C-alpha cells in the first residue's frame, strides 16, 4: 500500500517537469583510387600481429564526396528523401567504406556485412548512437525528460533494463496474443467495410494508411490496455491528430536535420516539426494519465490486494521502475516505434505477395494447413509456418524500417578493416545497401522468401553472413519491441492470407521507397482483397 501511495504522490507532481539532460575533408576520388584495404572488405580476420602487420590507415585516407558535392546530391539531385539510394550510389563509387561531412561532423559510412560486424561487436556495455539532436531540442524546449531513443550511457541502460521486462522475451510477447487477435478481428471487419464500399467491391485504395491505424490501435492496447478508436468509421479527434502529427513530424524532420538553424525563422519546417511533437506528447500524456486514474479508482474500490496488475504500463507503474518524468519522456517514443515497424513492413509484404501469386498461394497452403479457415491463429502455430516467417524476413531485408543506424565508440580508438579511427568517430551503418549485397543475397532485388528456409547441406544459396540483414539491430541496443512486432505481423498476415487472395489494383505500377527517417512507400499502395471460397 505504501508503494502505491508514493506512486500517487509522484504522479500528482507530474506537471512540475524537469529538463532533459541537460562535407568530407577529401575531394571526390575515382573508384580506382579506393584503398586496397577497402576492396578486400570481405575479410573478417582480426588485426595482424608481429612485424608483418601492415600500417593502419587514418580517417583522412578514406575516400568520399566533398562537402559541396554532398550538398549537391542531397538538395539539387533530391537524395534528401532517398538517402538509402544515395548510399548505394556512393558505395558503387567509393567502395564499402567512405566519409561524408555535414556541418562539423564527419561520418564513416559502412556498407558491407563484415564491416558492420566489426563495429557492432565492439559496442560495449552502453552502445552510443546518433544523439538525435533535433529530438533533444524539442525535449529541452518543453522541459521533458529524454526517452529511450535519445538517452545514452548509464541513463539509457537504466531505462532499457526497466523496459525490457514484460517485452523482450518471446514468452513474454506471447502473453499479448489475445489482445492482438482482438484488435486484428476489428481490423478485418474495418477492411471488409472499406473494400465493400469501393467501386469494385474489393479494393483498399491506401493499404498503408489502414495498417497504420491497426498498428496504433494495437500498440496502445498493449501499452495502456485502452482502445483508441483507430478502427472505427469515425476516428476520435485526438487520435486523428496524433496520426497526422506523426506523419508530419517525420516528414519535417528530414528538413530540420539538414537545413541550417538560421533558416528556422524563415522557413516553416521547424515550427511544424515542434508543433507536431507537441501533439504527439499531448496524446501520450493523456493516455498515461488515464491509466493512472484507472489504477487509483481500482485502489479505492478494492484496495491494494484487489488490484490485478495486467498491462505493460500498469506493471511498470506498480513496480516503480520508471519515474513519472521518464514515463512521459519514453512512452510517446514507444508508440512511434510500435506503429512504424508493423505498418510499413506489412504494406511491403502484401505488395510483394500480390506481385508473386505463386508465393502467395504457397503461403495460403501453409497457413490453412496449420490453421483452417474459421480458426484464429495462436502464437504456438507459427512454429509450423516457416514460409510465413520467411516472407516477413525477406520483406525486412528489402525494406529495413530504419535504413541506416549509427554507432559511436567512445571508450577507445577503433580498428576497422585496416583503418584506425579516433574515439568518438560516428559510424553510419548502411543497412539498406548491406541487405541488398549480391555477394550475400543472390538476386538481391528480387523477392525470394525461400532463401530463408533451410536447404540441403550442398546448397550454397542460403545466408552467407549473419550481419547481412539485421533489421532489428544487434546486441543490447537492438529493437525493444521486436518480439511483439514479429508476433503482430505473423498474426495479421496469416489471417489475411487465410481469408483473402491479394492482388494489385489496376494501374498500380511499381512502388518505390522514400526515406523519412523510416522507409515508406513513395505512393499509396492500392490492393484488391478477393474473398477466398
UniProtKB/Swiss-Prot annotation:
Q: Which GO terms describe its biological process?
A: bile acid biosynthetic process; C21-steroid hormone biosynthetic process; calcitriol biosynthetic process from calciol; cholesterol catabolic process; cholesterol metabolic process; steroid catabolic process
User: Could you tell me the EC number(s) of this protein?
Assistant: 1.14.15.15
* Annotated keywords: Acetylation, Cholesterol metabolism, Heme, Iron, Lipid biosynthesis, Lipid metabolism, Membrane, Metal-binding, Mitochondrion, Mitochondrion inner membrane, Monooxygenase, Oxidoreductase, Steroid biosynthesis, Steroid metabolism, Sterol metabolism, Transit peptide
Q: What is this protein's function?
A: Cytochrome P450 monooxygenase that catalyzes regio- and stereospecific hydroxylation of cholesterol and its derivatives. Hydroxylates (with R stereochemistry) the terminal methyl group of cholesterol side-chain in a three step reaction to yield at first a C26 alcohol, then a C26 aldehyde and finally a C26 acid. Regulates cholesterol homeostasis by catalyzing the conversion of excess cholesterol to bile acids via both the 'neutral' (classic) and the 'acid' (alternative) pathways.
Q: In which tissues is it expressed?
A: Expressed in liver, kidney and ovary.
Q: What class of enzyme is it?
A: oxidoreductase
Extract the ranges annotated as region (Disordered). 38-58
Q: Which domain of life is it from?
A: Eukaryota
Q: Which InterPro entries match?
A: CYP11_CYP27_families (IPR050479), Cyt_P450 (IPR001128), Cyt_P450_CS (IPR017972), Cyt_P450_E_grp-I (IPR002401), Cyt_P450_sf (IPR036396)
Q: How does it assemble?
A: Interacts with HSP70; this interaction is required for initial targeting to mitochondria.
Q: Where is this region: Sterol-binding?
A: 386-400
- Modified positions (N6-acetyllysine) are 142, 375, 512, 523
> What does the sequence similarity comment in the record state about its family?
Belongs to the cytochrome P450 family.
Q: Which GO terms describe its molecular function?
A: cholestanetetraol 26-dehydrogenase activity; cholesterol 26-hydroxylase activity; cholesterol 7-alpha-monooxygenase activity; cholesterol monooxygenase (side-chain-cleaving) activity; heme binding; Hsp70 protein binding; iron ion binding; vitamin D3 25-hydroxylase activity
Instruction: Enumerate the catalysed reactions.
Output: 5beta-cholestane-3alpha,7alpha,12alpha-triol + 6 reduced [adrenodoxin] + 3 O2 + 5 H(+) = (25R)-3alpha,7alpha,12alpha-trihydroxy-5beta-cholestan-26-oate + 6 oxidized [adrenodoxin] + 4 H2O; cholestanol + 2 reduced [adrenodoxin] + O2 + 2 H(+) = (25R)-26-hydroxycholestanol + 2 oxidized [adrenodoxin] + H2O; (25R)-3beta-hydroxycholest-5-en-7-one-26-al + 2 reduced [adrenodoxin] + O2 + H(+) = (25R)-3beta-hydroxycholest-5-en-7-one-26-oate + 2 oxidized [adrenodoxin] + H2O; (25R)-3beta,26-dihydroxycholest-5-en-7-one + 2 reduced [adrenodoxin] + O2 + 2 H(+) = (25R)-3beta-hydroxycholest-5-en-7-one-26-al + 2 oxidized [adrenodoxin] + 2 H2O
Quote the pathway field: Hormone biosynthesis; cholecalciferol biosynthesis; Steroid metabolism; cholesterol degradation; Lipid metabolism; bile acid biosynthesis
The transit peptide spans 1-32
Task: Choose one Gene Ontology CC annotation of this protein and give it.
Answer: mitochondrial inner membrane
This chain belongs to the protein called Sterol 26-hydroxylase, mitochondrial
Write the lineage as a comma-separated list: Eukaryota, Metazoa, Chordata, Craniata, Vertebrata
The cofactor required is:
heme
State the compartments where it is located.
Mitochondrion inner membrane
